[in-house]
From Swiss-Prot:
Residues 57-71 have a biased composition (Low complexity). This is Refilin-A. Belongs to the Refilin family. Its main location: cytoplasm. Residues 12-22 have a biased composition (Basic and acidic residues). Residues 29-39 have a biased composition (Pro residues). The modification Asymmetric dimethylarginine is found at residue 163. It comes from the Eukaryota. The gene is RFLNA. One of its GO terms (molecular function) is filamin binding. It is found in: Cytoplasm, Cytoskeleton. GO terms for biological process: actin filament bundle organization; negative regulation of bone mineralization involved in bone maturation; negative regulation of chondrocyte development; skeletal system morphogenesis. Keywords: Cytoplasm, Cytoskeleton, Methylation.
Length: 216
């Protein structure tokens, strides 16, 4: 049984050895030439024998009784460990607000019209804490046990009027004299209250007789 071995990079060297063999034959009439040293890329004898045996075995077809060896199956790589995914399912938060005011605020408001002045004095305001702004952020990273949430609650004492008493002073629409009622009230300082009374009467004189303002 003869096998054929094909090696890459050695075809040229085999052709040169064949030519040298023809020159070394006794019919050529030339002295034999020394055999060249094997090339540095020549394979080891064990590798050549193994390849020659494999090539010879491949030339013969396998018998019917011989079973083909199953191809080698590579082991499956280990599946990457899947971490549990964190998703916000339920989130609850309780907020407790104490509505009791710490102190009262007293102020006076003044409304001006074309021919009258309207005062609202003794107005009591209580700072009731009410929710004016609320924001919430929940961050749940996938495949991670890290969670972060932030809640921001803004409370402002929005004043609400509890009780007040109004006083209305009406002047004539075409009054020629100026009557003024002044009301001063400042927090933390002694307050002064001024009240003016105006009495009007009908007369024949074009210039109406007016009584001066009386300070009570």
């Amino acid at each position: 049984m003869v096998g054929h071995l094909h090696l890459q990079g050695m075809e040229d060297s085999l052709k040169e050895q064949g030519r040298e063999g023809l020159l070394d034959s006794p019919d050529s009439g030339l002295p034999p030439s020394p055999s060249p040293s094997p090339p540095f890329y020549s394979l080891a004898p064990g590798i050549l024998d193994a390849r020659a045996g494999g090539a010879g075995a491949s030339s013969e077809p396998p018998g019917p009784s011989e079973a083909r060896a199953p191809p080698s199956q590579l082991p499956n790589p280990p599946a990457s460990e899947m971490r549990p995914r964190m998703l916000p399912v339920f989130f609850g938060e309780s907020i407790k607000v104490n509505p009791e005011p710490t102190h009262e605020i007293r102020c006076n408001s003044e409304v001006k019209y074309a021919s009258e002045k309207h005062f609202q004095d003794k107005v009591f305001y209580a700072p009731v804490p009410t929710v004016t702004a609320y924001s919430e952020t929940i961050v749940a990273a996938p495949n991670c046990t890290w969670r972060n949430y932030r809640s921001q609650l803004t409370l402002e004492p929005r004043p609400r009027a509890l009780r007040f008493r109004s006083t209305t002073i009406i002047f004539p629409k075409h009054a020629r004299s100026t009557f003024r009622t002044t009301l001063h009230c400042s927090l933390g300082r002694p307050s002064r209250w001024f009240t003016a009374s105006v009495q009007l009467q009908l007369c024949q004189d074009p210039a109406p007789s007016l009584l001066g303002p009386a300070t009570l």
